[in-house]
Amino acid sequence: MIMNDIAESGLTLDRGPRVLLDAVGQDPAGPLSVGIAGPGGHGKTALLTELARVHQRAGIAVRTIAPQPGEAVDPDTVVLVDDAHLLDDARVEVLLRLVATRRHRLVVAHRPWPRSAALSELVDALRRDGQAMLLTPFTREQTAAYLAGTPELGRRDDLVDFVHTQTGGVPRDVERLARGLAGTDTRTGAVVNPPRSVVAEFGPDLDVQPTAVQRLLLAVAAGGTLPVSMLGALVDREPAAVDDLIATTRAAGLLGADGRLTPIVRRAVTTLSPTTERNAVCRRLTELQLARGGVVLPLVRSLLAVGALSDCPVTTLTAAANEALADEPAFAAELFAAATAAGHPAGAKQALAAALAGNLDDALRLADRLLATAAPPDRREAAVVAATALAHRGHVGRSVELYRWAGTASATSFATVGAIATGDLGVTAEPPPGDPTGEPSTMHASAARLTATGVRDSVSGPPTAALSALVQAAALLEPDGRAALLPDSPAALAALTAVHCGELEIAERVLHRALAGGVGGPLMARRHRLLQAWILMVRGETHAATERLATVTLDGRQLESRDLLFAAAIRMGVSRRNSDLGALKRGWGQALEAVVRHPVDLFTLLPLGELAIAGARLGDLARLEPYLIQGRALLSRLGDPPLWSVPLRWSGLHAAILTAEPATADEHVTALLAAADHSRYAAVVAAAAQSWVEVLRGDVDPIRVEAAARGLHDTGLCWDGARLAGQAAIRTADRRAMTTLLECARALQGRPSGGPAPATGASTTRVAGPTQQGLSDREYEVAELVLAGLTYREIGDRLFISAKTVEHHVARMRNRLNCANRTELLALLRTLVADRASDTAGQPWPQRAVR
C-alpha cells in the first residue's frame, strides 16, 4: 500500500487495493465510488497517487482538490480527495451531493478520527453506492515483499524480522526504515537499532500533534498500557476526552490498535521529545503509580530500552529496584547504583541485590561501608549481607560473628548452622522461639530455624529427623524464596544430608524444586546445580554430570571458593570414574588450589573425600593430608556423628586401597562397622567396605560380594557397586563365580550383559582359568591407554610393542572378561583399573593381623 520508490517496483498491495486498481485499469471510465479509511502512514496517499496515474494514462482528467460549495464539477473528471477528515462540513456536503447524483466518479480517503457527522454520512453513502476499504499494516510477508524490492536489503529473514518488529508493519515506517538501512551495514548481527536518521524522520509527525497527545505518547512510551483514569490525571482530561486523544493518536499512525507503540515509534517519542517534558511525564507517572499502589518497573524498563534511564527520578529508580529484587537481582543492583549515582545514599538493599545476583565483591564492599557509617537498621541488614557473602567464601567463623551481631531470628539460626559447620558444639541447644528484636516470625525466619534444627539433628540425632527438618525448611522457601539471602540453602543442606544417607532421589527432588522456584536467587542457583552434578557423578552418569557442571558457569562469573571446591571435586571424580589419568593429572593443581582457598568445614567433607581418592590415585595424597586431619578433628569435636563421618571413612578406605596401606584400610573398615547401626546407608557401606578388603586379600565370597555391590547400587553408589563386583571377579579363582560377578558388574552399570550366565563349568570356556589372577601388568597398561583414547598404533609406540600385539592384548582381555563387544569391554575396564595403583596391581594383600 506504499510505493517502493527505491527500486521502482510499484506498490506492495493488500487484496482490496489490488482488486480496485485492477478494475480501474480494465475500465477507467466505469463507475467509481470508494471510501478509503486508514491511519496516517498506511498508504492512502500512495493509493490515490496510483489511481490518478492509471486514469491519466487512460486520458481521463483527475481532480485532487475537494470542490468548494457551489463549484461545478465535470462528470467526466475523476475526483480523488485525500485527508477528507480535515475538510469542513460544507465541503464534505459537496462531496456527499456528488455521490448522491451517481454521475460522478469519486474516491475519498480519510483517517478514522476525527469523524464528524457529515463525514460519517459521506462514508456511509460511499459504502452504499460503491465500496469502503480499510488499509491495515503490512503482514510479515508483505514487509518481506517490500524489502525484496530494495537491492541493498533483499529478502534476508533477519532483516525482515527486524524491520517488521520495529515498525509493526506500518507502511510509512517500513519505507523509512528500509530507506535508512539501504545505506548502512546490514550484515547479520550488525543491525541492532534503527539508524538515527530514520528516527529523526518522525520529528515532524510528533511536532504537529497537540501537547496532550505528545504527553500521552510519552506516557505510553514509558509505562506501556496504562488505565484511562491514570492517563486522564496525567493530561488533566475527563475519561471521554482521553478516549478522543487515544483515537487521535491511533489515527495518526503512532499508536497501535492494541494501545502500544512500535519500538521505532517508542524510540522516536523518547529521544525526540524535550528532556524537561519527558522528565515531567515520568515523575508524574511515578507519582500516580505509587499513589495507586501500582508498579513502576515497566516505566523504568522502557526508559532503559531507549537510553533515558538517567532522566528517571531517584524515587522511581529505588521503587523499581525493589520491585526487581526478587526476580532480577542484577537489574535491581543496577537500578540501585543508578539511584546512588543520582545522589541517593547507598543502602543495605543495594548490597542485598548485589549479593543475590552473585556479585559478592560489590556486596561486601557496600556492606562493609554501611557497617561503619549507616544507621542501626541498615547496619543490621548490612551485617547479614556481609555474613552471607563471607559464608560463601569460606570465612564461616567471621560469618557466624556477624550473624550473631545482627541478632534477628534468621541471623541467629544461620549463626547456629555456621557454628556447627566449624565444629562448635556449644550452640547445639534449641534457640529461643521468636525474634529477639520483637518482630513477628516470617516464613524466611521459620525456614532458617528449621534449617538450624536439621543441622543440629544431623550431628546429634537420627538422620531421618535431620533430613525431615531440612526438607521441610526447603519447602517453606519454595513459594517465595527468590529474594531470600542464604549462606547455604535448606535445599542444598537437605540434598547433602540425603546424599550422606544414600537417599539420592530425595536429594534430586529437593534440588529440582529449589531451582524451579529460584530459591536464593542466582547466588544459590550455582550451588544447587553443582549438587545435581555431584549426584549424577556418584551414580556413575559421568557424561550427564559433566553437562550439568557446564551449566554452572554459563554466565561467565567466577565461582566462589565453596562452589569452586565442589566443581573441582566433580571434575576429578568424573575423570577418576572415566579412568582418565591425563585429566586427573591436569586437574590436580586446580583441585589443590580449591582446597587451599576454602577452610575445612562440615559441609565440604564430601568433596574433600573425593579429592583424597584422586590424590591417592595420583600418588600425591600427602599434600591433602593436613586438610584431612582438620576434617577428622572437626568430626571429633562434634562427637564423630556417623551421618558425616561415614562418607569420609568410605573415601579414606579407597584412598588407602590405592596407596596400598592395608592397616589404614582396616582402621576405616573398623570405624565403618562401628557406625553400621546408625542408618541403612551406614550398614550398606560397612558391609561393602568389609567385603572389599576381603576381596583384596584374595578371599572372594561371590554371594557376599554381590549382596554388598547391589546394596551400594541401591543406595545410589552405582559406580562403586559395579566396581566392587568387577574387582572381585578378576581376583577369584572360581570360573563360575567370576562369570557371576562380571554379569553383576555389567548389570549394575546399567548396560546389557554379554549373555546369560553359564549354568555349568563346562560352558565357561570364555572365562579365565582358576590359575589366573585378574589382568597382567601389561594388560593393565594397555587397558589404561585404551581408556585414554589412544589408537593401537599410539599404544604400541608408547609401550614399544607392535599395534598387532596391542590388538591381541585387547582381544584376550575381552575374551577373559566375557564381554560381548568393545563397548562392554571399555565399561568394565573402567571399573577394573580405577583402583589400580601403579606398583600394587593384582597383588593380594596380606591377611589382617589377629589382635
Question: Where in this protein do the model-derived segments appear?
Answer:
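Helix-loop-helix "sensor" segment of P-loop NTPases
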Residues: 22-26, 105, 114-166, 180-195, ...
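Extended alpha-helical scaffolding segments used for macromolecular assembly and cargo binding
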Residues: 33, 277-357, 366-369, 702-724
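Short capping/hinge segments at domain boundaries that bridge a core fold to an adjacent linker or tail
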Residues: 45-47, 194-199, 222-229, 239-287, ...
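Conserved P-loop NTPase "ATPase switch" module shared by AAA+ and STAND
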Residues: 66-92, 107-112
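Winged-helix-like regulatory helical subdomains adjacent to P-loop NTPase cores
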Residues: 190-225, 234-237
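Helix-turn-helix DNA-binding segment
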Residues: 214, 762-851
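Alpha-solenoid helical repeat architecture
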Residues: 240, 257, 294-297, 343-348, ...
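Amphipathic alpha-helical segments of tetratricopeptide repeats
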Residues: 251, 340-341, 368-372, 400, ...
